[in-house]
Every structure is written in structure tokens, then in C-alpha cells.
């Protein structure tokens, strides 16, 4: 208490007078307000709380989060799922337009603000639905002895009777008929083509027969075309999709395994976004920078006919193959004990013909956007997204996610209407069109709004579809790993069996099923491609979390992937049989992440972890890559020197990140003292948001993929589903090994320097002064 003079004391002897009582009341109110402020903790929101309450804002945050989770209902998810999967809805069709407006209607009814669509004019591909694709085998006399139907049969009429639903096709495959000998090339990756050549089998002028799995189908076809193939056939091996046997008791609809005439559909485009408008949005009023012929010439689109076949049709090919037996790791289970052969060609002079009927068309697609505007920082976006177009009905991919996202929106708005909670930052709901053709809707959106996103977007959280019922599975960048883990600890376990074993949260099962044993945490990978998070991270530098539920399996995805048997029956009776409890848990996790990013005072981004991962993981991997380069001692020293400089910059990042942690803690303290002065918070958050942007190279890191601009995490050139750590460096090493030259050697050093420059950018971003 400040010193009070004697005269003042004498003048204030009447302590019960009116003016003095008012003064004491004011002081007491101010003191109680201070206690309320001190209780604010690390969260802020638009909630109008009682400043005299003894309940802390952290308690209120947990209560609000639980309320949102409790408001997410399985019955609503089931309702939305049936609405969105009534008929086949391929991108660019009237049926998919109906789904877009059904989503907009659901979001509007829930109470989202400014729900609208964003159209783009893009190049899509369709089959001739009146003339199915086919595989034909003729004997040496030219007589037809086998012809595939090209159509999968209806198994559950109530859900699968849409016209043309069973058509078997692959988008962007070349139109035409080719006859040639067939060659088996396993999974169709780079090593498979290399090993086939070493075994003396030439692909040129042949039809390539390849198994799905362990890579993007478009990359398989791209490599086959590069090797000289004139056609390609893709099939799902029973070792992947029918592991318990192919009799009726062990496949759909009795189980989740693929039935004998099921096929995987998909896109063959080698790249993301509209193939005719790289770098720029495909708007009706804008010029297309590339022609169809140019897209085919540079490998973006295939020019050879390609079709998918069932394992039943594949057996007709495999049992006729001539040539030597395949290596043991190329052997599958089609035909039981059948030994796969390499070819080329069939025994007994039989011939193979494939007929593919396809057409390229420019069509209008439309994304759906809706908002919950933030009360404190409306210009900061927490973005949630899923695509809604499907190859057929899409009850798993993607509309399990579409239904869950609609319910998250509804539950959040219910919470807003029934409590005083409102997110501090804006939550943006996004439904993407034409993802299946090559992430087109999301890529065009990012290309159109990249400048806005780089200024306003905090994070993009993607959930494509539910792939299984065993465990949560998360891909994210190092700065967000901790928050992905922490959120899972707050979501109840959807499995009765898991709860009976003492694993009460989603995190507990995740740690059990997908452990990173050395790190003592669940396994988390860096995001690759294959879904709508990719353009946000790789093109715009917006940090992402991509998650789903899946089973522990060596196969890439679930057996019925992209088949016509993805209808609600599969979700409800085969995959998520406890009243869609897994779907609900996915929604709860999505909402928990969104609310955390929306309401944390200081954004939950950890640059210290990024620096640690760089030093402990990324740099050792890079060192191993450059150590294998066949160069002279002098040239290697030049590479080693630049690597050492990158290592030094990474150490600088670690030091600066730890120092910045102190700044973040000070900001927490300052906000708790005075929540009405947000200048410290804004300064810290601005720098945190900017760190991921440092890794965007405007010139790109891939000659083949215009959307690959992230120098750490861009999608692999060899597999569009996988990330490629420091892709620019890896591409430069590959170029040098293919064609050794001083120029290519210098490019390796240049690419290492480019990564170093990005690391230095992060260091400078975190500094208080330049």
C-alpha cells in the first residue's frame, strides 16, 4: 500500500461515509476482476463468462469441448450418410451437383454463415457407359475364348441399383483398342521396371499387367508408358483384398473383403489440379495455359488405354502367362497355388486385346464453403475439409467423412446456440469437388486464394474417409505433432472391447496399435499426397493434419476401396458395427482439434520439435543419401561442406526455438494479466503462422508437379501418394546419378542450400529483430 500522509489520514476518519464506501466497493470489484483475469489461463474465446466466477477459463474450455463432443450424434451421421450416397455421384455430373447442394442445405440448416459454392471449369474424363471396357482373349486361330464383362454385379439391390454404377473404368485412360503380348510387372514401381529389365523382359510394344498397392496407380501407368507399353491393366490381388479366401462366405457382403467381380476405380492423372491450368485457378474467364496434347506430351495425362479388372478376370490372364516364374516377392495369391509368370505373352499362341472407351470433357465443378465466424480474431482461419465426389456411391470414400463433417458443423452450432461459447477464431468448413480426379477442387481453391491463405490460414485439418475400425491414424508436420496427440487423449474410445481392456481414450488404442516405440508416442508420419491436405501444405505452406481411422494392415487401404460396394450397408454392418461409434469418435477428434486451434491464446505450434526432428531424423537421412553419390573426393567435399552449413543452421534453429519458447511463456503471462491487450499475442502468433511459409519455394521443387513447392515435405516424384523428404535434393541426386555432370552436381549443392535458406528464414522469423 502506498504511503499516506498524516493529513490525509485525518481527513479520512469517517470510514463509513458514502463516498468512501463507494471507493471500497470499486477497489473490491477491481480486485475480483483481477482474480477473474488471472484465471483466464491459456484459452480465449467469444464466451461471455461471469468475471466473479471461481471456475477457471480452462475449466470452461474443457466443459465447452465436452459439450461439443456430446452433441455429436451417431444417428445424425447415419442420416447424412444416406442423404449423400443415394446415387452414384462422379464429379461433373448432375448427381454430384445434387450432393453439393445437399451439403450446402445441411450446413445452412445447422446455422453456418455465408454458405456458398465456388465453381471451376476443369478437364474431367468419363467412360462410354453404354459400351463397357473389356479384356478379350483369342486363341491362335483368332476365336474369342474369353471376354470380361466390364461391369461389377449388383449385390444389395436396395443400395446399388443406380444406372451404370457397376462400370469398370479409370479416369484419363487413353481411348482405343490395342492387341499385344502381356508382361507382368508386379506393383509397377521404379524398382520393378528396373528388375524386369535385368531379367531380360522388354516392355516396349506390350500390355503391362500390374497389381494395385504400394504406390499411386497413375505413377504405375506413367512408368509403363515411359518404358514403351502400349496399354495397361491394373488388378487387385487376393493377397491384398481377399486374404481369407474368395468363396462367398469370406467376401462381401458377408465380410469386408472384395467380392470376385469387384474392381478399384480411380484417376491416372500424374499431378494435381486441373491439368490444363497449372499454377492458376481454372476459372471460366481465365486463359488455359496448357492444351490436352501438351498435357499428354509431358506425361500429365496418359495416352495409352488402361483399365481395371477384377481378380477373377486377372486369373484368366495369369494362368495363361508364359515365360519364367516371377521372383518370390512378386508372387500373389490369385488362383491359390498358381505360379505367376513374367511373360511376354500367353502359352499356346493366345492373344490379348483390351478395349477402352473414354472421353475427355470440360465440366463445371463446385466447392462448398461455410463459416463459423470468430469472436476475437475473425480473420484467422481454422480450416476443416473433406471431399464429396465419389467414383460410385462413396459411403466410405469420401462420404463417411462428408457425413461426419456435417455433424461437426451441426454440433458446434448447437453448442453456440445453447451456451455462450463462440470460437475466438473463424472455423471454415470446406467440401471439395473432383478430389478423385486429382485433388482438383482443393487445388484450384488454393491456387485462387493462396495469398489470402498465407496471410490468414492457421491450419488445415483434413479427413478424407474412415478406412477401418482399429485405431486413429495421423499424418502431420512436426510443429503440430504434440497437439494431434493431446487431442486424442480427450476423445473417448469408441470400441467396447478396447474400453474393457482399460484403453479408455482414442489415444490409448492409437498408442497400442501404431506405436513409435523409440519415441514413446504413437507413430506419426509426414503427410504425403492423395488427399486435399496436399495443396495446402505443398503449395501454400499451410500446416496440416490429415487423419482417419484404419486397420493395421500391410495393404495401402481397405479392400472395398473405390468399388461399387461402398454403400451404407458396408459402414453400418461391416466396418463400424457399434452404431457408427467410430464415425462419431472421428467427429469428436475433428471438433477437439478445431476448438483447440480456434481458442488457444497462443497457437499450439512447436518449432522446437521441428528443429529437433531436423537434427535427429531429417539430416541423418540426407547424409545417408549424399554418402551414396558416386563422385570424386573433391566434389564430395563440396557437397559435404554445404551439408555442414545446413546442419549449423538447423542447430541455430534449435537455439532460437528454445528462446522463442520463453517469449511464448511471457505472452501467456501477459495475457493472463491483461487479456484486453493482445499485442504480445498477435506478435507471437504472427511469427508462428509464418514459419511453415518459409519452406515454400516459389520456383517449385519438381519439374513434373507444379503444386510441389515445399522444400521439406513435397510429394514424391516417384509416388504421388508419398511424401519425399527434401524432394528438391532427392530429385537433383537422381538427375546426377542418371546423367553425371558438373551442372547436375552443382544442382545438388544448390538444393541443399535452398533448404538451408528456408531454415534460416524460420530463424529470422522467430527473432525479435532482424
Curated annotation (Swiss-Prot):
It is a single-pass type II membrane protein. Residues 41-770 are extracellular. GO terms for biological process: proteolysis. The active site is at 435 (nucleophile). Glycans are attached at residues 175, 337, 417, 469, 551, 606, 630. Residues 282-597 are annotated as: Catalytic. Zn(2+) 2 binds at residues 397, 436, 562. Residues 1-19 are cytoplasmic. Its EC number is 3.4.17.21. This is Glutamate carboxypeptidase 2 homolog. The lineage of its organism: Eukaryota, Metazoa, Ecdysozoa, Nematoda, Chromadorea. The gene is gcp-2.1.
Amino acid at each position: 500500500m502506498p504511503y499516506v500522509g498524516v493529513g490525509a489520514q485525518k481527513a479520512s476518519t469517517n470510514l463509513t461515509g458514502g463516498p468512501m464506501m463507494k471507493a471500497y466497493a470499486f477497489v473490491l470489484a477491481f480486485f475480483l476482476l483481477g482474480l477473474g483475469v488471472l484465471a483466464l489461463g491459456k484459452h480465449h474465446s467469444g464466451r461471455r463468462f461471469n468475471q466473479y466466477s471461481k471456475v477457471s477459463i480452462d475449466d470452461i474450455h474443457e466443459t465447452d469441448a465436452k459439450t461439443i463432443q456430446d452433441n455429436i450424434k451417431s444417428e445424425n451421421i447415419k442420416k447424412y450418410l444416406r442423404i449423400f450416397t443415394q446415387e452414384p455421384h462422379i464429379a461433373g455430373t448432375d448427381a454430384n451437383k445434387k450432393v453439393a447442394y445437399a451439403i450446402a442445405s445441411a450446413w445452412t440448416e445447422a446455422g453456418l454463415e455465408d454458405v456458398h459454392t465456388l465453381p471451376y471449369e476443369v478437364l474431367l474424363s468419363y467412360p462410354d457407359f453404354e459400351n463397357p471396357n473389356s479384356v478379350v482373349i483369342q486363341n491362335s486361330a483368332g476365336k474369342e475364348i474369353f471376354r470380361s464383362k466390364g461391369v461389377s454385379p449388383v449385390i444389395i439391390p436396395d443400395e446399388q441399383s443406380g444406372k451404370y454404377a457397376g462400370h469398370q473404368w479409370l479416369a484419363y485412360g487413353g481411348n482405343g483398342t490395342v492387341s499385344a503380348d502381356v508382361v507382368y510387372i508386379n506393383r509397377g514401381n521404379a524398382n520393378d521396371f528396373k528388375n524386369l529389365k535385368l531379367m531380360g523382359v522388354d516392355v516396349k510394344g506390350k500390355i503391362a499387367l500390374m497389381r494395385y498397392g504400394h504406390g499411386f496407380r497413375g505413377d504405375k501407368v506413367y512408368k509403363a508408358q515411359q518404358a514403351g507399353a502400349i496399354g495397361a491393366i491394373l488388378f487387385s490381388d487376393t493377397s491384398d483384398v481377399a486374404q481369407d479366401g474368395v468363396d462367398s462366405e469370406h467376401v462381401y457382403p458377408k465380410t469386408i473383403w472384395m467380392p470376385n467381380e469387384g474392381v478399384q476405380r480411380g484417376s491416372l492423372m500424374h499431378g494435381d489440379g486441373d491439368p490444363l491450368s497449372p499454377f492458376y485457378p481454372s476459372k471460366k474467364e481465365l486463359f488455359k495455359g496448357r492444351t490436352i496434347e501438351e498435357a499428354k506430351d509431358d506425361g500429365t495425362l496418359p495416352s495409352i488405354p488402361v483399365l481395371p479388372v477384377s481378380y477373377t478376370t486377372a486369373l484368366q490372364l495369369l494362368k495363361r502367362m508364359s515365360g519364367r516364374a516371377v521372383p518370390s516377392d512378386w508372387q500373389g495369391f490369385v488362383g491359390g497355388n498358381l505360379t505367376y509368370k513374367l511373360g511376354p505373352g500367353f502359352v499356346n499362341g493366345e492373344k490379348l486385346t483390351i478395349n477402352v472407351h473414354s472421353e475427355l470433357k470440360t465440366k463445371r465443378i463446385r466447392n462448398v464453403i461455410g463459416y463459423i465466424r470468430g469472436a476475437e480474431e475473425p480473420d484467422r482461419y481454422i480450416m476443416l475439409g473433406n471431399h464429396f465426389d465419389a467414383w460410385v456411391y462413396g459411403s466410405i470414400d469420401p462420404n463417411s467423412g462428408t457425413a461426419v463433417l456435417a455433424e461437426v458443423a451441426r454440433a458446434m452450432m448447437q453448442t453456440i446456440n445453447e451456451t455462450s461459447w463462440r470460437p475466438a477464431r473463424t472455423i471454415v468448413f470446406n467440401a471439395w469437388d473432383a478430389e478423385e480426379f486429382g485433388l482438383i477442387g482443393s487445388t484450384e481453391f488454393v491456387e485462387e486464394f493462396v495469398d489470402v491463405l498465407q496471410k490468414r490460414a492457421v491450419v488445415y485439418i483434413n479427413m478424407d474417409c474412415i478406412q477401418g475400425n482399429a485405431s486413429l491414424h495421423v499424418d502431420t508436420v512436426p510443429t503440430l505433432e504434440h497437439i494431434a496427440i493431446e487431442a486424442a487423449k480427450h476423445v473417448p474410445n469408441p470400441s467396447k472391447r478396447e474400453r474393457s481392456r482399460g484403453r479408455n481414450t482414442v489415444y490409448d488404442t492409437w498408442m497400442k496399435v501404431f506405436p513409435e516405440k523409440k519415441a514413446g508416442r504413437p507413430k506419426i508420419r509426414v503427410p504425403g499426397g492423395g488427399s486435399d491436405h496436399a495443396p495446402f501444405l505443398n503449395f501454400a505452406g499451410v500446416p496440416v493434419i490429415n487423419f482417419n481411422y484404419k486397420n493395421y494392415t500391410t495393404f495401402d487401404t481397405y479392400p472395398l476401396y473405390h468399388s461399387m460396394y461402398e454403400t451404407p450397408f458396408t459402414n453400418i454392418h461391416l466396418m463400424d458395427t457399434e452404431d457408427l461409434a467410430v464415425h462419431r469418435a472421428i467427429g469428436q477428434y475433428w471438433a477437439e482439434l478445431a476448438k483447440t486451434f480456434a481458442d488457444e491464446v497462443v497457437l499450439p505450434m512447436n518449432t522446437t520439435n521441428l528443429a529437433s526432428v531436423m537434427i535427429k531424423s531429417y539430416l541423418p537421412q540426407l547424409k545417408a543419401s549424399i554418402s551414396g553419390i558416386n563422385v570424386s573426393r573433391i566434389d564430395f567435399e563440396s557437397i559435404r561442406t554445404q551439408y555442414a552449413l545446413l546442419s549449423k543452421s538447423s542447430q541455430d534453429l534449435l537455439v532460437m526455438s528454445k528462446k522463442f519458447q520463453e517469449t511464448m511463456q511471457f505472452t501467456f503471462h501477459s495475457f493472463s494479466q491483461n487479456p484486453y491487450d493482445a499485442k504480445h499475442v498477435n506478435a507471437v502468433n504472427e511469427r508462428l503462422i509464418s514459419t511453415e511459409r518459409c519452406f515454400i519455394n516459389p520456383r517449385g521443387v519438381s519439374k513434373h508437379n507444379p503444386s510441389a513447392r515445399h522444400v521439406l515435405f513435397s510429394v514424391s516424384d516417384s509416388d504421388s501418394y508419398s511424401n519425399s523428404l527434401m524432394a528438391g535434393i532427392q530429385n537433383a541426386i537422381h538427375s546426377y546419378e542418371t546423367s553425371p555432370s558438373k551442372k547436375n552436381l552443382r544442382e545438388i549443392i544448390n538444393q541443399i542450400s535452398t533448404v538451408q535458406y528456408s531454415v534460416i528464414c524460420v530463424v529470422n522469423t522467430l527473432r525479435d529483430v532482424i
